């Protein structure tokens, strides 16, 4: 009696594999043993669907392709959703840090492009953000930069989510005021 293949853990359907992956860094590492050194490779990979979901993962193995495969699997399991403004930039400026890695992410006007250093650029390209200005202030270690970028992205929130948390309207959060009848004439005279 043949069993039907399961659809992953929890019975969830597998998503269409429209996920792109970017290799951030690969590093040869050594384990010192009695007979000398054992070499392995450590890989850091960022994955995303370019629609607001992104994740990162690290993998280590004796061969480069196996390390990249492990890192990619871990990255797919650690994906987060980031709210984007108009599908191209962040809603607000945000700061993040991990260890000595500190990053500042700023939303940008249309046509600005991705102004960011190497590891951060891979995160934004995988995320689908087209306009952002980012600056790394601390450690230049790729692992710390990526983790600091994710710490910042996790702090991002949309005006709609802020409004629902506070029990207000989105217009109250954004500071847009509707003119009250009778005040239009007063503003013209002032």
Curated annotation (Swiss-Prot):
UniProtKB keywords: Ribonucleoprotein, Ribosomal protein, RNA-binding, rRNA-binding
GO MF assignments: rRNA binding; structural constituent of ribosome
A Pfam family recorded for this sequence: Ribosomal_S5_C
Basic and acidic residues: compositionally biased ranges: 169-179
UniProt key word Zinc: no
GO annotation, cellular component aspect: small ribosomal subunit
Residue span(s) of domain S5 DRBM: 19-82
Annotated stretches, region: Disordered: 161-190
GO annotation, biological process: translation
Signal peptide: none
SUPFAM superfamilies in alphabetical order: dsRNA-binding domain-like (SSF54768), Ribosomal protein S5 domain 2-like (SSF54211)
UniProt comment concerning the protein's domains: The N-terminal domain interacts with the head of the 30S subunit; the C-terminal domain interacts with the body and contacts protein S4. The interaction surface between S4 and S5 is involved in control of translational fidelity.
Family, similarity comment: Belongs to the universal ribosomal protein uS5 family.
Subunit text: Part of the 30S ribosomal subunit. Contacts proteins S4 and S8.
Function according to Swiss-Prot or TrEMBL: With S4 and S12 plays an important role in translational accuracy.
Protein name: Small ribosomal subunit protein uS5
Organism: Granulibacter bethesdensis (strain ATCC BAA-1260 / CGDNIH1)
């Amino acid at each position: 009696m043949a069993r039907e293949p399961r659809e992953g853990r929890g019975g969830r359907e597998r998503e269409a594999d429209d996920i792109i992956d970017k290799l951030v860094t690969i590093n040869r590492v050594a384990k010192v043993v009695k007979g000398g050194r054992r070499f392995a490779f450590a890989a850091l990979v960022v994955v995303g669907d370019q629609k607001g979901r992104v994740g990162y993962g690290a993998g280590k193995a004796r061969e480069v392709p196996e390390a990249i495969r492990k890192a990619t699997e871990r990255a797919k399991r650690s994906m987060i959703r980031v709210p984007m403004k108009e599908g191209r930039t962040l809603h607000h400026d945000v700061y993040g840090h991990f260890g000595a890695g500190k990053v500042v992410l700023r939303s940008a006007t249309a046509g600005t492009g991705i102004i960011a250093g190497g590891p951060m650029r891979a995160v934004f390209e995988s995320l689908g953000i087209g306009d952002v200005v980012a600056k790394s202030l601390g450690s230049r270690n790729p692992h710390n930069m990526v983790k600091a970028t994710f710490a910042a992205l996790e702090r991002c929130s949309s005006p709609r989510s802020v409004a629902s948390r506070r029990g207000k309207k989105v217009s109250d959060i954004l500071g847009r005021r509707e003119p009250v009848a009778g005040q239009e004439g007063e503003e013209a005279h002032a």
